Structure formats: structure tokens, C-alpha cells
Amino acid sequence: MEKLYESMYQLIVETSTKLPKDVRRAILKAKQRENAGTRAAMSLATITENIKMADENVSPICQDTGLPTFKIKVPVGINQIQIKETIKKAIAQATKDGKLRPNSVDSLTGENSGDNLGEGLPVVKFEQWEKDYMDVRLILKGGGCENKNIQYSLPCELEGLGRAGRDLDGIRKCILHAVYQAQGQGCSAGFIGVGIGGDRSAGYDLAKEQLFREVDDVNPNEELRQLEEYIMENANKLGIGTMGFGGETTLLGCKVGAMHRIPASFFVSVAYNCWAFRRLGVHIDPNTGEIIKWLYQDGEDVDFQENAAQEEHLASTDSERRVITLQAPITEEQIRELKVGDVVRINGIIYTGRDAIHKYLMDHDAPVDLNGQIIYHCGPVMLKDENGNWEVKAAGPTTSIREEPYQGDIMKKFGIRAVMGKGGMGQKTLQALKEHGGVYLNAIGGAAQYYADCIEAVEGVDLLEFGIPEAMWHLRVKDFTAVVTMDSHGNSLHEDIEKSSLEKLSQFKEPVFS
């Protein structure tokens, strides 16, 4: 199979940089449902612009290229060891070329391998079948949405919905609750795969397997088809919306599978995937390794360009939204003037900082003066050019809630005035913003090309020993846009949306399926 390496490399690059047609159709449909001038409409306009930029730049749609998971069906007699080794080489090369972010971290030492290889990685699952070609599918599922996966053991009590029993209606309640609990932290609007039955590990495997189905397919099981349709209709009544900003579309796809279980266990497992649903597949000639056919590419191309001029006009004339320009160092007085809903455009220097940096700063001095500065929750994709200078390939926000134990203390300790990420933060941070005079800025999750385009230069880097995603990058930006979703007056859009969506969730308490 002399062409297999080339085919696997192409599959990896295409999966990271180009959304499949079925996903694009779902996003376009969501865009058409939103009311013009809303935060959700603005977010979807940014998302579709980002998709176009990733196409043109052949660069990652989202900087978090996730944990590569391959599902492969092969004819009897094919050398699976050879296939796996070829995939590893292609993964390492794609990482070196900036198509994947180095995401493989030793769980004990915290060391990043730098090439997306390591114990158990990438995940490659084989299955034999009696066909004369190979079926290779790849999903790149980022950490933000992976962390919103959830598993229920029935019977159980669910917030807003009451008791969920061991029946189809209990399953219905679990799925609705799974969408509710994700809020905007998994980069909604999202896609979910649901696995009913099995043990804990098999249930999650089944849930993730559903994500390999076409978005617009029809479940052959009549009960599950009805359940999928019900969830799609009613989950979108929760009002969580794109990025958790509120809106008409919270869920873009729901696929449910079922398997047998043992009498003592009844699990409902939900795999949540962000809007940047990066999964593709190919059929491979087992003799040559060449690609015979691409999967998930049926139907017409989706053109997001048609309404671009209208969106730009609406964005520039929306009288309900204040747009404020900020440049660090920022004063407390400037921060106190900001309120939830304001759109901020940042110029000047921002500093990235995520899990390793926040843990480090609790016990160490900062490598730079952070007084009045902006911390960006981001693990970018970076490459060195031929002159040895760092170049930003992708730079969207990461999920901020992971920094909740540290954020308020660090802001006060170093005088930080703004933190930027996605999905919002909790009560401890909100209280610190109020006491200290700070704001939380929500950037559009997954919009890695859109934000990379706002970065004019990499001015420096500290703590690179933590690995590229976890280092502190000094980025000079221009017109870097985000929304104030938590202000210094105790207001939180995330808290408001969570409260209102819980009220809406409780409307679905009564039985539907007998």
C-alpha cells in the first residue's frame, strides 16, 4: 500500500481544515433561523467567516484539533499493524506542518510529546468486514466539547426534570438534560451522539460512534427516529443558543444508538460535539492505499458568502450594541464603564494563559508585568517560519471554566483587568470581578482562523517548557473582538441563560413516551 501514507495525511489535513457538507448544511440552517442583529447572529456570522478562512488558508478550523480517533474497517487479511504505523507517521507530519496542534500530554509528568503521539495515541479502532475495500473515518473532537460528555445511570433524579426511569421517557429526559448542562461551554450549537445501554465504557463508545453518522440521515429504528426528532425540536426551545449567548438554535444534530445491557445497569451516555464538527472518511484501495471515495461530501456545496454583505451592514448599523475599543494597560475606571452585552475590540498586547500557566502563577511571579493587562485563555497552533520567527496558525479561545479555581485570585494578585475565553466562568470569578474591577470577555469558540487574522505579531513567549498550547504567548492584536458577558457590577449573561434555560427545561417534565 505505497499510497496509504499520502492518503492518511490528506484525510488528516482535510478533517482539520474543511468541514464536511452535511455539517455546513446544518450550520447554514441555524444561521437562517436566527434574528438579525442578535449576539447569536453575530456569532454565527463569525463562525461562517471562520469556516471560509480555514478553507482558503488550509489551516485548522479550531486551534484545538482534539484527540485524533480513527475508526477503520478492513478486509480479512490486511496488516493492521502496518496501517497503524502509517497513521502515526502521517499524524506526526501533520503536526509538524501546523495542521494539528501538539495535544499529546503525559498524564503523569505533564510533558507534551510535541507530535501528537504517545501512550494510546492516536486512538485507532479496527474492525474486519467482508468487503474488498477499507473504510477509514477520523474524528477530531476538541477538549471543550469532550469535557461536556455526560453519562447517566438510570433511575436518577435530574434537575428541572425530576425522576428519569428505566424507559424511553427516562432516556428522553437524560438527553434533554445533557444539552442543558453543556450550556455554551462545549461551543454550542452542538451535535450529540447518544448511546443507550452497554457498560460505562461501551456506552461512551456507542455514543461517539453515533457521531460518525450523517447529520441528515434517518434512524432505521422507528422508536429512536422519533426520539431523535423530538430532541431536535425541543432542545432548541431551551434558548441556550450559539456560544450560550441565547438564541433559536442550541442543537444542530442528535443521533441515538442502543445496545443490550446487563439487568443491574442502565446507562445513557452522551457525547457532545461542538459546531466545528470535524469528522471525515474515505474508502481506500487495500492494494495501493489510494483514496477511492470521500465520505460525508454528498449534496451541493454550501455557500456562506451570499449574505456576507448584508451581515456586515447589519453588524455595523446595529444600534442596540455598544462597541468599545480597549488597549492595555486598562484602568479600573475603564472596566467599571463596561457592562454585559458590550462588544469590545482590543488593540495592543494580550497574553495567553491556560491550565499550566494558571497553576504556575498561583505559586510563582509572572514572567511579565500583568498589571492592567488582558489574559487570553488560548492554546494556539504555532509554527516557526524560515527565519525562526513564530507564526500563529490558529488562535481561538479555550473553555474558561477550567480556570475557575484560580482566576479570581490571580487577577487580584497581578492586577489583571480582563480575562478572555469562551463559555463563561463561575461565582468565584464573578465575585472577584466585582471586588477587583474586572471583566470577562467571551470570544467566539472555534473561530481560530478569524482570531489568528487579528494577530499582527508574536512579541515573545514565556514558559515554553509547558508545551506550545500551555506556554504564555505575547500577542500583538488589532480589532480582536469579544463580548462582555460578565462585568464588574455582578452581572453574568451565562448565569442568566442558565437560569432561563432551566425554567424552560422544567416544561418538559411530564411524560411523552409511554
Curated annotation (Swiss-Prot):
Co-factor binding details: Binds 1 [4Fe-4S] cluster per subunit.
Gene Ontology biological process terms from the UniProt entry: tricarboxylic acid cycle
Keyword rRNA-binding applies: no
Obligatory cofactor(s): [4Fe-4S] cluster
Gene3D superfamilies: Fe-S hydro-lyase, tartrate dehydratase beta-type, catalytic domain
Catalysed reactions, as listed in the record: (S)-malate = fumarate + H2O
One Pfam family recorded for the sequence: Fumerase
Disulfide cross-links: none
A molecular function GO annotation: metal ion binding
Enzyme Commission designation: 4.2.1.2
InterPro entries linked: Fe-S_hydro-lyase_TtdA-typ_cat, Fe-S_hydro-lyase_TtdB-typ_cat, Fe-S_hydroAse_TtdB_cat_sf, Fe_dep_fumarate_hydratase
Keyword list, A-Z: 4Fe-4S, Iron, Iron-sulfur, Lyase, Metal-binding, Tricarboxylic acid cycle
Pathway named in the protein's UniProt entry: Carbohydrate metabolism; tricarboxylic acid cycle; (S)-malate from fumarate: step 1/1
Residues annotated as binding [4Fe-4S] cluster: C62, C187, C274
Function summary: Catalyzes the reversible hydration of fumarate to (S)-malate.
Subunit architecture: Homodimer.
PANTHER family cross-referenced by the UniProt entry: L(+)-TARTRATE DEHYDRATASE SUBUNIT BETA, L(+)-TARTRATE DEHYDRATASE SUBUNIT BETA-RELATED
Homology family: Belongs to the class-I fumarase family.
Protein name: Putative fumarate hydratase class I
Organism of provenance: Geobacillus stearothermophilus (Bacillus stearothermophilus)
Gene: fumA
